[in-house]
Amino acid sequence: MKPILLVGEARGEVEARMNSSFVGPSGAELLRMLNESGIITFTFADRDYLHRYYSQSDPSCIEAIWGLHPEVVRTNVFQIHPPRNDLEYFCGPKAEGIPGYPALIKSKYVREEFANELDRLADEIMGSDPNLIICLGNTALWALGGRTGITKLRGTTLLSTHTAADFKLLPTYHPSAILRQWDNRPTVIADLMKAKRESAFPEIRRPPREIWIEPTLDDIRTFKSTFIDQCKLLSVDIETSGQRVTCIGFAPNNSTAIVIPFDDARQPSGSYWPTREDEAKCWNLVRSILGDSRIPKLFQNGSYDVSFLLRAYGIKTLNCAEDTMLLSHALQPEGLKGLGYLGSI
């Protein structure tokens, strides 16, 4: 089994003194999260070292734990301790930046004099040849993915485009950020659990999807009879503009869906359907699906969708069985509940 490579941003004061990576408070927290996510498994020796670290503040205890787990390899983008832990130490104007790399911090570019750090990182990646690289924080995402925005991209599998190309990446928050904002810890645990699954193979595997778009009335009837009428749980979602539904989607399983549009900006009339009669027939099909009490339905924030359909179109939705937003709130009341976030974990 190939190791998982953990890439952080830069050495802290403790790491610089120990000439190592992740041996201070961030390293201790990272080890705990790796254990909780199943990437490593603590033994009695691990727990003893961790107890001694917290009681004695001895970073050699954290170094000893890392030594017990060859299944993970750790490094940083910069094996340098910037003064005051300020990443702007590495940065300058665009004219001084490393060619081909975007800004790291607010129009500030990593100066070309530090390009040797990226060369060293590339050598480390090629030497360990991991199936998966976990980018811990924005700097690692910048160095390997050629972009920033850790909050938006965390939990997403990507291919590296910079420094060492075509390695699978999974970005998540840096453990030092977790020490500052504990609410994000469950998110990192979820990302690391995904990382464990992804580390079994080097390629990015996307599940197959069959999505029917721009359907005719006959397409909708066929999809309904083939997939919807006998499904065990039907996912439903609407998009709205003002007091109109612009489109509605139905997914009878996790690989098949249909998107039924009502608005189309390409048409002079603004409507997807060529005639009012066709649109009325389409709404009758939608009404028959939503009003079928035999079909359990799943929503995300369904109170909005169901009330909107009833208020704007007089459509009563029967057998609203589940709501992913409410389920996620019941499971983790303090967590985020948006559909994008739920999909990322």
PLM ranges: what are they?
Residues V14-E15, N19-R32, S37-I39, I204-I345:
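Conserved RNase H-like, two-metal-ion catalytic cores of nucleic-acid enzymes
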